[in-house]
Design a protein with these regions (language model features):
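PLP-dependent enzyme catalytic core of the Aspartate aminotransferase-like
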Residues: 107-108, 284-292, 296-351
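Active-site phosphate-binding strand-loop segment of PLP-dependent enzymes
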Residues: 93-163
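A short helix-loop-beta submotif of the ANL/AMP-binding
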Residues: 83-89
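Conserved core segment of the aminotransferase class I/II
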Residues: 171, 176-246, 250-259, 341-343
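Conserved PLP-anchoring active-site segment centered on the Schiff-base-forming lysine
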Residues: 59-81
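N-terminal small-domain helix-loop-helix segment of the aminotransferase-like
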Residues: 1-48, 55, 231-233, 345-351
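Conserved glycine-rich beta-strand-loop-beta hairpin in the small C-terminal domain of fold type I
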Residues: 228, 243-256, 264-283, 319
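A short helix->loop->beta-strand "cap" motif at the edges of active sites that frequently abuts
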Residues: 65, 86, 144-149, 175-176
Length: 351
């Protein structure tokens, strides 16, 4: 990036879909890592995956079109669908099933208004990884509905503890109806660079290009040069980060299982736990204030334990809270200790 700045060659507007050499590198990444064969013209560089999702929804949705969303989901999915005049249709899942919907649930959610389905793997907020077997089951359902577009958010691809990431578009006869999204925030810790990309069937990619051309235009030229270097450098840093996250996950999992009243599963990717905490609803703190929701519990823990958690309501799971383990081992151990102490103070009778 510094070299690009010093050269003075990248101060003009880049092409709307991104520099050709960058899109070529993304195409090679898709081919080598994901078994996807998107041409350069089927790739659009964006200002991050949220921008990609926005481009996609505004490009494919007409007013009243439905988009199936696996819940829990990343909070922006439902908001962006609604902004684009679409209707989110939620498929609710349970922690006992690792937050994976059954193919029967998927089939029951489909109507004649269904335009697309969106999910992330690994998933934020649950850490769920959809295996090839899982995706094959969903494919069985979707083969009976050829007009439905699949939107696969793979931003956490390299924080996958199963070591078997599967892109939905790599399944037989699925690439021609799958939009694959990825970026640099997680694998390369480049959150501030705002750099994402889409691989999409050509006609959809053309529509996305038009949409982006009339809104943000191209992504920052210098960010693209940094992204190109990151792709060329390979995944060694991502593998190192994944190993660290795996150690932290195991530490937090053991600590959370020591806390009475919390129901927790073992996430297979990303860097979040999403425990079920509804057993604390109806309990009271030492001031007699009753806990009635995940939001109430999160506020209580912020005040009493000085631990920041995200309530599950906006993720489509009102009985859960999200805990990130993107912190040091010392901080995580201390946080779990505080959570245990503060939750232990809650009583059902206010005593």
């Amino acid at each position: 990036a510094k070299k690009a700045i010093d050269s003075g060659d990248f101060f003009s507007y880049p092409p709307v879909p991104g520099y050709l050499d960058f899109r070529e590198a993304i195409s090679e990444k898709f081919k080598n890592e994901n078994k996807l064969n998107y041409s350069n013209d089927e790739i659009i560089v964006s200002n991050g995956v949220k921008h990609s999702i926005t481009n996609v929804m505004y490009s494919i949705l007409n007013k009243g079109d439905e988009v199936i969303v696996f819940a829990p989901f990343w909070v922006s999915y439902s908001a962006i669908i609604t902004l684009a005049d679409g209707i989110p249709v939620y498929v609710n899942t349970q922690i006992e099933n690792d937050f994976k919907p059954t193919k029967e649930q998927l089939n029951n959610a489909i109507t004649d208004k269904t335009k697309a389905i969106i999910f992330s793997s690994p998933c934020n907020p649950t850490g769920t990884v959809f295996t090839k077997k899982d995706l094959e089951e969903y494919k069985e359902v979707l083969e009976n509905h050829q007009d439905i577009i699949i939107i696969s958010d793979e931003i956490y691809e390299h924080i996958n503890f199963t070591n078997e990431h599967c892109s939905f578009g790599s399944l037989e006869n699925m690439q021609n109806r799958t939009i694959t999204m990825n970026g640099f925030s997680k694998a390369f810790a480049m959150t501030g660079w705002r750099l994402g990309y889409i691989g999409a069937p050509l006609q959809i990619a053309k529509s996305i290009k038009k949409m982006q051309g009339q809104t943000t235009s191209a992504n920052c030229s210098i960010a693209q040069r940094a992204g190109l270097v990151a792709l060329m450098a390979g995944n060694e840093c991502a593998l190192e980060m994944k190993a660290e996250y795996l150690k932290r996950r195991d530490i937090v999992y053991d600590k959370l299982n020591e806390i009475e009243g919390i129901k927790v599963n073992l996430p297979q990717g990303a860097f979040y736990f999403f425990p079920e905490i509804s057993s604390f609803f109806g309990c009271k703190d030492s001031n007699g204030i009753q806990i009635n929701s995940a939001n109430d519990l999160s506020l209580y823990l912020l005040k009493d334990a000085k631990v920041s958690l995200v309530p599950g309501e906006d993720f489509g799971a009102p009985n859960c809270i999200r805990l990130s383990y993107a912190a040091s081992e010392i901080e995580l151990i201390e946080a779990c200790k505080r959570l245990k102490e503060s939750l232990g103070k809650l009583t059902s009778n206010g005593g």
